[in-house]
Amino acid sequence: MTMRLESKVAAVTGGGAGIGEAICHRLAAEGARVAALDISLPAARQVIKAIGDGLAAEVDVSDSAAVDAAIACVEREMGPVDILVNNAGAVGLDHVRRVSPLLERQRAEMAAGKVQTPLDALVRLSDEEWRYLMAVHLDGTFYCTRAAVRSMSWRGTGVIVNMASICGLEGCTGHPHYSAAKAGILGFTRSAAKELIVQGIRVNAVAPGFVDTSRLKGTLDAGRQAIAARTPAGRLGTPAEIAATVAFLASDDAAYFVGATLSPNGGLVTAV
């Protein structure tokens, strides 16, 4: 493993599990000093314990004051943030559980040659579910970026990697709120990148395809095989593959990437 990130301070939101956990491990393996920020402090502590060194802190990214406090904690304990990975997210699990039975009926009807069951995901979506995903994904990405840039800008250096999704590129059936939030992150990334590069801060995004995480295993068991079957690569992605993409963007190897979106997705989307 190369040490491209030696001595860099990296703050990873949603660092307590799944893709975020893999990102923490990969950045640490490349020499970074990692702060795992997560809404679950025990989960973040477990990740840092496994790494062997670093900082674990609790944060609700939808709370701007909590974000400011968490970034201040990182800078107080570890020094200025060199790398920020805005990875914290949610999929609206209650919504997924309601829509999954309809998806299964649609698959059966498609096999029979005629679809008669509408998803009606949009009209079933509550105000609370819509706002929750916007708060976690969009508000959280903005709050964390703003907090980190306050110190990055006067130092004239820094890297920010935002976690989007192929759902933000082309939309995902049954998830209008998630798709809208992830598309918003892509727009925010492009705008912030153009503004901040003149201050020496690079901003880019990663838009993964479907990744084999515990969240997918717990909510979409029946759909996982169908997703893998329609992916040209024939399988789901792994958290480690997404983490490798993040590590590249965080390194000087990606010095000419500004406002870019890298999409490791197994061929589901080939034009980004």
Where on the chain are the PLM-derived regions?
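Short C-terminal tail/terminal secondary-structure segment
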Residues: 2, 89-91, 170, 247, ...
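Alpha-helical segment proximal to the catalytic Tyr-Lys
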Residues: 150, 194-195, 255
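Residue(s) in the substrate-gating loop at a strand-loop-helix junction
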Residues: 165
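Catalytic Tyr-X3-Lys loop
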Residues: 90, 101-142, 157, 161, ...
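Canonical Rossmann dinucleotide-binding motif of NAD(H)/NADP(H)-dependent dehydrogenases/reductases
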Residues: 3-35, 192
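Short, small/polar-rich loop/turn modules that mediate ligand/substrate recognition or access, typified
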Residues: 197, 202, 257-259
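Active-site helix of classical SDR
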Residues: 145, 181, 189
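The beta1-alpha1 cofactor-binding region of Rossmann-like NAD(H)/NADP(H)-dependent oxidoreductases
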Residues: 41-42, 59-71, 90, 127, ...
